[in-house]
Amino acid sequence: MLMRLYTFFAAALLACCAAAGPLHPELPQLVGKSWIPDWWFPFPRPSTRAATTTTTPATSTTGLATTTTKPTTTSSKPVTPTPQPATSTAQPAISSTANATATATASSASTSTTSSSTSASTSTSAAAPSTPTTVVPFGQVIRSCTVKGTVAITFDDGPYDYTNKLLDIFDANGAKATLFVNAQNFGSITDYSSVMLRAFNTGHQIASHTYDHADLSTLNGAGIISEMTKLDDVLATITNGYRPTYMRVPYFAYSPLVLQTMADLKYHVIEADIDTKDYEHDTPDGVSVSVGFFRDGLNAGGSIALAHDVHQTTVDLLIQQLLDEVKRRGLKAVTVGECLGDPRANWYRTTPVQVPTGTSTTSPTATPTSPGTPPPAPTQPGVASNCQKWHTVVSGDTCYDIAAANGISLDNLYKWNPAVGTSCASLWLGYAVCVGV
């Protein structure tokens, strides 16, 4: 009897210790030992309570609602959660009702952050056009850059034998050029297809200078359109379907009809506010004069420079000095499109221009200030109809000599005699050129 009473008190003591928490790591094992008979315990065996306590965490690990809810509290901070809810909700493991509830809780916790960003991204993608929208106007004469710190050095009348070397120089200097090209001028553009494709592929800008350097101010609407579309079609075969949206009017000879047609065809019309006059100083000794014009133009705030890649002296001696001057001033030599803040996607179109209906087929009517004097010899097309003074070309004449002898600028000589060309390549012996209006 005493032994049983002793055993009863010992078992009761062990049960109390187990309920209060183990005082020694061996006590739970002792309570659970099978050698203590069940009938010695007047109340449920202490090991049953211990087993229940142990299995509770096991149950909670299988119920993902508990574990998911706890991270939700941490992840509901507005700073962190963005990428992770999308990943976790996408996992196929989250399929139970409890998990759906937890996910909904997490989603609602971050609604203020995600909903605003989602709506913002939705509205942006919906409004974004397939190509950037240009801010550069069509059919208006543009003479200067709009992006601070940029200069655009442009070249007319090519391509020609020196254009490839010009690209070498620009590439070596980390600069970009804009080429206003003709299909037929000093040479045929198809003979320089590889040069044109190289310029296009390396980020230089190719722009239109009409098909054959025509004086657009002497043409009717159909003639102007033809000069633009014929060059477009040739360029498209070279540049894999791309056609320029930028152009320069030969001789800067504008008329209201020219500008209206450029607006209708959606061309950006580029002039220049710096003239290097390299066509007048196409000798090694004349290079310093052209550099001086360039510096003076920059000092006056100019930013779009005019030069010609058809002159060897320009390419061999002038261009590097111009690029050095740009670097010295901390400026950047870029394309016209870039200096106007226009993305490269806008420099070209992939479909032919849309010709407006009702295009005029009549030639513009000349309105001279006074009737012209009859020429003493044959004249070339486009000569000024109000010319008062003529010079008949003789052997050895140059445009520079003719202009100097008659006290006029080369610009005026070329303007009054557009067929001669700004390089004086078509000064015909025995023909009369206008030297005064």
Swiss-Prot record:
GO biological process assignments: carbohydrate metabolic process
Family matches, as SMART domains: LysM
Extent of the signal sequence: 1-20
Subcellular location: Secreted
Positions annotated to bind substrate: Y251
Positions of region (Disordered): 47-132, 350-384
Bias (Low complexity) ranges: 350-370
Enzyme class: hydrolase
Keyword Metal-binding set for record: yes
Pfam families linked to this entry: LysM (PF01476), Polysacc_deac_1 (PF01522)
Keyword Hydrolase recorded: yes
PANTHER family found in the cross-reference section: CHITIN DEACETYLASE, CHITIN DEACETYLASE-RELATED
Function noted in UniProt: Catalyzes the deacetylation of N-acetylglucosamine (GlcNAc) residues in peptidoglycan.
Protein name: Probable peptidoglycan-N-acetylglucosamine deacetylase ARB_03699
